[in-house]
Amino acid sequence: MAPPPDTSGSCSAFHECERIFAQWGYPFQDYSESFRQSLDTVCRCSRFFLGVVKRDAHVIPLLASLFEGQTPERNPSADLQQRVAEVADRNGLMRVLRQWRNREMAIIAWQDICGLLDIDSVLTRISETAESAIRTALDWLFDDACRRWGVPRRKDGSAQSLVVLGMGKLGGYELNFSSDIDLVFAYVEDGELPGRNGATYAEFYTRLAQSLVHVLDAVTEDGFVFRVDVRLRPFGESGPLVVSFDSCERYYQAQARDWERYAMVKVRAVGGDAKDGREFERFFHPFVYRRYLDYRVFGELRSLKARIMAELRRKDRGDNIKLGAGGIREIEFIGQAFQLIRGGRNVELQDRRILVVLERLGRLRLLEHGTASFLCAAYRFLRKVENRLQQYEDKQTHELPVSEERRGLLAFSMGFESWEGFLHRLDEVRRRVHEIFTEVIAEPPQPARGEPLLDGGEAELSQALAGFDGAAEAMTGALVKFRASAPVRRLGAGARAELQRVIGKLLAELAAFRVSDPVGVLGRILELFESIAGRGVYFSLLAENPSALSQLVRLAAASPWIVRLIAGAPILLDELLDPRTLYSPLTRESLGREADILFSSLAPDDDEQLMLRLRQFKAAHQLRIAAADIMNVIPVMVVSDYLTDLAEVVIERVLRLAWKFAAARHGIPPVEAETSVDFPGFGIIAYGKLGGIELGYGSDLDLVFLYDGVASDAVTDGPRPISAAEFYARVVQRMVSLLTADMPGGALYEVDLRLRPSGSSGLLVSKADAYENYQLHQAWTWERQALVRARFVAGDPKVGARFDAIRRNVLCRERDSRQVRLDVRSMREKMREHLADRRPGVFDLKQGVGGIADIEFIVQFGVLISAAKHCEITRWTDTVRLLDSLRAINFLELGQADRLRCAYCDYRGRVHRLALQEMPALAASSEFPGHRTAVEAVWKQIIEAPVF
């Protein structure tokens, strides 16, 4: 770094360096020109540094060694501990701490100003310096206090130290150069010290904390160690200096204010017993990171920011680079807003370091990638400016200098040739930061409809709804009924105000969207609001995000099923925030990765939370699929693909839980061949719509369970051994229980196990050999029809391969086509008689003549009588690809296959849409005449052909 132009008061820095060298007896010319230049530069930019090298003879040779790379890896903390071990009293402790601190901070200032450390490393080094000082001082003071007053002990007899919690920038390894440190003091167990007049532990730890604050904070002839702020403790300045774990728990559960969550985002134990410190950190976690999405954070941050700005204006300190517009605090608020809203559900955001959080916000697309990158760069720039301001005199300032000399030095130290160039860059950064802050945190514009719709009379409501013409009266009635409902009447003032905002915006959206049935859509959404009224945070979400409310109106207009889905899992409202993800269902691999991330934040033994989270996961992705379906983003066949992928991911996760549950009690059965798979010897076979990759929105799961590769007399290897068959049966029982349990959000899936060998009277899990024997020698034709659509979906791949071989062997057998035709026709007639809706004017899309079941039976018949000569057609399990396969072997003519495929896809599409409308799979008898005629013709030609 070239020296700055000589300015008054700084031109003598070089000569001052020469005098200092001479003072300590170091030959000035023996050091390299570049090293001497670095000292000159830093002495110009930091009076603090100049003062330290004047007082401490050891600094210059240490810096020279560092500069030339001749010093082995330093351990400042160990150096401090060694020095403190030699002190005899508190005055000696204070002197050693200050001298050590000044030396370390001078080294950091030199490395920072000369560009030898990046700003991230500088902030970390300062934080580590503070933590070393805290830990070392506390250890000395604790030992001293124990000698004086006795040792506080736990119930198990071990010594119990004070726990020191670092808040704010100290906790996040982000301390600036002349920062104060925010500390909270706590201890785990209450008690009394030994002795006739023994003090309580509270008194002991209070004295200890007071001593620590004094040792660190007091200003002596050697300066201070770190300024200490203890106002973030429970009850603030009016509360005790030290709190017990129980008191702390009661406070944060019942009395803590919302703004205290922000202070706790970075909390970290920085002194005392490490195990106790981790316990305190874990305690704060649920207070900071809520399990639900708390959009009230935006309003709270706006209020806090407004108070800060008002205070700055009052003190005429608007040019503050930390608290002013576009300053450091606004960047921190942006990151913390997302942490506090989403951190409870997204473990990646549970990080103390703001730069890590911002980077992850970009990666998770919660912020635009470019925006996140800019904020990281802006944060580093502003923190560098902050350090330069404070390094000058070791003062805690955030104000830009006024004098020409100081301005020139600041610009130079930041790498700019002029103050004007630096200020231009600073203003650019702050302007863009403030723009982003406003976009993220600022209150959204209010709609024109601002009437007190929850409190006014019917006349005001009618006036507000005048633009809806004939629907106004019915909508007025719906709103009157809604606001009189018990959940709405019980709302607190804050939630009621948020709901007031939402209702006004809702009516504006209904008018702007020109909903064809505003009464019905309003009614659905009001029912949803009534069901979520106990969680006012969801009203905050909709009030803060007009686009989410807009998406809700569109989806509610298209599907009451979606509204009911959201009512069962209100967390889904968060999915409406970003149309890019709302209308973009995930692939099988992406679903698996998201599930892994989602569950990684939960305790592995917390099955209840795992299952609740799994229900939310399933519902969120069902919503994405339905939204993309409604908006015609994906075709009908892909809808079923996505629903099938989702079900498979859920099944795999439930299998993991069930397996873990059984294995913890009984161990696992030994398999005959060595394997490293997760579920040795066990496989899940999907039948029906899941097996055929044709799942619908309300489909249940037809499942069959197999085991293989396990000796018939094998037992598990755990503390309570059971037979292999019994172990696998318990896994299945647990799986079914988890899948069908009625929890908030409903069951995951309904499960049907009747397609297993011997149906409801058969074993829950079949040995593969027995399953094969049953399929070959005992199964009915309809069971072999079902096998056409069966496939392996989870478990041991070896069991999957065994099942594939069994299925191929069974399906590719020679059959009497005459008997198969009779069986298929008979079964279909029974189904029509018992399942079809035969009312006049109605066409049953699934069971009616010429409907879906007829197409599926034609395909299954074709496979059963053709696979012996064309075994390759058994490769597929879904109807559409089987139609193509049957066309390829000339079982179907080209026109027949095309007409059946077209009819099948159109029918399935209508069934999906009806499910979203919560309507049965029925159409008017006048609909689909061409499809019905075509299917009937093929049915008659193939299934009802004369049997001789």
Swiss-Prot record:
Per the UniProt record, the lineage of the source organism begins with: Bacteria, Pseudomonadati, Pseudomonadota, Gammaproteobacteria, Methylococcales
What job does this protein perform?
A: Involved in the regulation of glutamine synthetase GlnA, a key enzyme in the process to assimilate ammonia. When cellular nitrogen levels are high, the C-terminal adenylyl transferase (AT) inactivates GlnA by covalent transfer of an adenylyl group from ATP to specific tyrosine residue of GlnA, thus reducing its activity. Conversely, when nitrogen levels are low, the N-terminal adenylyl removase (AR) activates GlnA by removing the adenylyl group by phosphorolysis, increasing its activity.
Gene of origin? glnE
- Which stretches of sequence are listed as region Adenylyl removase? 1-445
Region (Adenylyl transferase), start-end ranges:
451-948
EC number in record: 2.7.7.89, 2.7.7.42
- Enumerate the GO terms in the molecular function aspect: [glutamate-ammonia-ligase] adenylyltransferase activity; [glutamine synthetase]-adenylyl-L-tyrosine phosphorylase activity; ATP binding; magnesium ion binding
Q: Which SUPFAM superfamilies match?
A: Nucleotidyltransferase (SSF81301), Nucleotidyltransferase substrate binding subunit/domain (SSF81593)
Query: What protein name does the entry list?
Result: Bifunctional glutamine synthetase adenylyltransferase/adenylyl-removing enzyme
The GO cellular component terms are: cytosol
Q: Which residues cross the membrane?
A: none
HAMAP family assigned: GlnE (MF_00802)
Q: Does the keyword Nucleotide-binding apply?
A: yes
Which residues, if any, are the signal sequence?
none
Question: Which cofactors is this protein said to need?
Answer: Mg(2+)
